[in-house]
Regions:
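Mid-bilayer segments of alpha-helical transmembrane spans in multi-pass integral membrane proteins
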Residues: 136-149, 168-185, 205-214, 218, ...
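Helical hairpin unit composed of two closely spaced alpha helices linked by a short loop
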Residues: 307-348, 356
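Juxtamembrane helix-boundary/capping and inter-helix hinge elements in multi-pass membrane proteins
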Residues: 127, 228-232, 343-351
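Gly/Ser-rich, low-complexity
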Residues: 1-112, 116-135, 149-159, 163-164, ...
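Generic multipass alpha-helical transmembrane bundles of integral membrane proteins
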Residues: 191-312
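Alpha-helical membrane-inserting segments
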Residues: 114, 118, 122, 219, ...
Length: 392
């Protein structure tokens, strides 16, 4: 009988020691285990390569090392990126772009002044036909200058939207995989269709439908000011309203669907996880509680990795859109300022055309901002996914 008791006590302490060893896992151990997962490791390597390739096109992320950033975030709770260097790069970029757009502003103002002088000279000679020829000659040069800068801005906006889409296509599979491995199966199942729509369809809607509508409104502004008598103001306003309605509708539907489905799925995952942990705690003798706590610890570390990747993703997303926003904001401001400066001295049709071009630039800027907003919200939903695991 005594031997049996000794054997039972030995087994009990032996099992407890094993459970303790399994439960205590260091951060480096968890990171190593995640790096050994083939799917996650493959996606991470692809993401690192993609970010390194982006550095040739986006100079603001030259100082970002994705591998070191994630390691620093996991160990210290924050990345190792120097925001002072980023700020210095942004200021340098702004000054460089200001020099460029000031040349554009100077060209516009000179043409407006020249048009005004020619008109005054021809009015003094009482020759309407020559005056009209001089006006249309200056107007044509103005159209060429504004169109060149606007087409460059359209190209920048398209590249920004496609760049955001490509980056999201690279980082979202990793985040979704980690959420699924952390127990958020229902959340992944509901987010997958939304992510597919966001990454593949929404950028095409903007590039192939909304931006061409903005280009049409830009062209119609010049047609509207060709004549002082025949106007198409209502058509210009209608096209602008359509572009705004399309953007507002897409944002509203996307965010509402994402929020509702995310809340519902996270609730289901929370109930499932608590039920599973309760079953492990109560139906597995001796080691059930330790095993349940070990699962929570491992999953908690996986969420830290997810948050590190999400933090880096948000930072890169901001850096991707920063240059296009700075460029388009400055050009739009120059258009508006040029229209204001030339209004007292130039023909009303000239200033109206410049102001209309500025309004079209604002619509172009809204495309980048609305696409960025949707992906920001998607990032926020994914970053908050899995919090029930730690609290559950």
């Amino acid at each position: 009988m005594k031997k049996i008791w000794i054997l039972l006590i030995f087994i009990f302490f032996f099992s407890a020691l094993n459970c303790r060893a399994d439960e205590v896992l260091t951060e480096d151990k968890i990171i190593e285990e995640y790096s050994q997962d083939e799917s996650i490791n493959s996606n991470l390597n692809s993401l690192y390569t993609y970010i390194d390739n982006m550095k040739t096109d986006i100079e603001l992320i030259n100082d970002l090392n994705p591998v070191e950033y994630i390691k620093s975030y996991i160990k210290n709770g924050k990345g190792n990126i120097s925001f002072s260097l980023i700020l210095k790069s942004v200021v340098s970029l702004i000054f460089k772009e200001v020099k460029t757009v000031l040349k554009l502003s100077l060209s516009i103002i000179i043409i407006a002044i020249l048009c005004s002088l020619l008109k005054n000279i021809q009015d003094a000679l009482s020759s309407d036909s020559i005056s009209n020829i001089a006006f249309y000659a200056c107007y044509l040069v103005l159209i060429l200058i504004l169109s060149k800068s606007f087409l460059v801005s359209i190209s920048i906006a398209k590249e920004a939207i496609y760049g955001i889409s490509a980056f999201m296509n690279g980082i979202l599979p990793i985040l979704v995989s980690i959420i699924a491995l952390s127990g958020g199966v229902m959340e992944v199942a509901t987010l997958d269709p939304i992510i597919l729509v966001a990454v593949l369809i929404i950028p095409k809607i903007y590039v192939n439908i909304i931006i061409p509508l903005i280009l049409i409104s830009f062209v119609l502004e010049f047609a509207n000011n060709l004549s002082e008598e025949h106007k198409i103001n209502n058509l210009c306003k209608t096209i602008k309203q359509i572009t705004l309605w399309l953007q507002g509708g897409i944002i509203t539907i996307f965010i509402a669907t994402l929020t509702i489905r995310g809340i519902t799925s996270s609730t289901i995952d929370a109930v499932t996880l608590k039920t599973t942990k309760f079953a492990i705690d109560n139906f597995i003798p001796i080691v059930g509680k330790a095993f349940s706590d070990a699962i929570s610890s491992v999953v908690g570390y996986s969420l830290i990795i997810k948050n590190a990747i999400s933090s880096m993703g948000l930072l890169i997303l901001v850096l991707i859109i920063l240059y296009p926003i700075i460029k388009i904001v400055l050009i739009s401001f120059i258009y508006k300022m040029s229209a204001a400066l030339t209004e007292p001295i130039s023909d009303k049709r000239i200033t109206s055309s410049i102001e209309g071009a500025g309004n079209a630039m604002v619509l172009l800027l809204s495309c980048i901002l609305s696409v960025s907003l949707m992906f920001f919200v998607l990032f926020a939903i994914i970053a908050s996914a899995g919090k029930f695991i730690v609290g559950g």
